[in-house]
Regions:
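Conserved non-catalytic scaffold segment of RNase H-like nuclease domains
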Residues: 2-124, 168, 172-178
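Short, glycine/acidic-enriched loop or turn micro-motifs at the edges of active sites
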Residues: 23-25, 144, 194
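A broadly used, surface-exposed interaction patch
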Residues: 73-76, 80-85, 128, 150-151, ...
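Alpha-helix capping at helix-to-loop junctions
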Residues: 95, 99-102, 123-127, 145-155, ...
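Acidic, Mg2+-coordinating catalytic module of metal-dependent nucleases/exonucleases
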Residues: 104-117, 153-206
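A short alpha->loop->secondary-structure connector
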Residues: 120-134
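Short alpha-helix plus adjacent loop in nuclease-associated cores
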Residues: 134-161
Length: 206
């Protein structure tokens, strides 16, 4: 997968930033980020840098039990005083993403969830909100590439069958079905690594 960057002309090196969040729930207007992870790569998806941070629970947030079970986050970890506050974590995330700009920001199902939650986090903590699509940055969603590949390159990926008997494109089942040992699903950094793996599989078929 190669792109020309808008500020550098044809042939300029593009960097991708693959990122993921683990949260207290699925409501992007209410829930908060508990873990953020990102890996920056070159245009051949070779790793250049990585970043990961966890933070403490905000006092007004009631986490969903299902989210804690899925992520394996214990009540003790939620209030661990050695972790940064939500505000401190947001500042570090914003600073790192700014340092990595301009880039193409990518996630898995990120456009409908992680992207919205990240913007809400930056809004709440007085950080620049539209980091991923301003100042030369662009964004995308690897799930959209997965959906497109099933039409234009149906043999590129093995699409597993879920418990309902229907095809599923959830990352924690898609990655193993295509040969990736995704043993730590719903850890933000592990999910980023799995997302890069899927992107590479699609890239080899492009």
């Amino acid at each position: 997968m190669r792109f020309s960057r808008r500020d550098g002309g044809e042939g300029a090196m593009t960097s991708f930033v693959f990122y993921d969040t683990e949260t207290t729930g699925t409501d992007t207007a209410f829930d908060q980020i508990l873990q953020f992870a990102a890996i920056r790569t070159d245009d051949n998806m070779r790793e250049l840098d990585r970043f990961e941070i966890r933070c403490r629970l905000l006092p007004h947030i009631v986490p969903a039990v299902g989210a804690l079970i899925a992520t394996g986050v214990s009540p003790r970890l939620l209030t661990d005083s050695t972790l940064p506050t939500h505000y401190e974590a947001a500042r570090q995330i914003a600073r790192k993403l700014a340092d990595w700009s301009p880039s193409i920001f990518l996630g898995y199902n990120s456009m409908s969830f992680d992207e919205e939650l990240l913007r809400q986090t930056f809004y709440q903590t007085l950080q620049p909100i539209y980091v991923t699509n301003t100042n030369g940055n662009t964004r995308g969603d690897i799930l959209s590439l997965v959906n497109a590949s099933t039409v234009v390159a149906p043999t590129a990926l093995t699409i597993p069958i879920g418990t309902s008997g229907k095809p599923t494109r959830k990352l924690d089942t898609l990655a193993p079905a295509n040969g990736y040992a995704h043993s730590n699903a719903h850890d933000a950094l592990a999910d980023v690594e799995a997302t890069i793996f899927i992107a590479k599989v699609i890239g080899r078929m492009s």
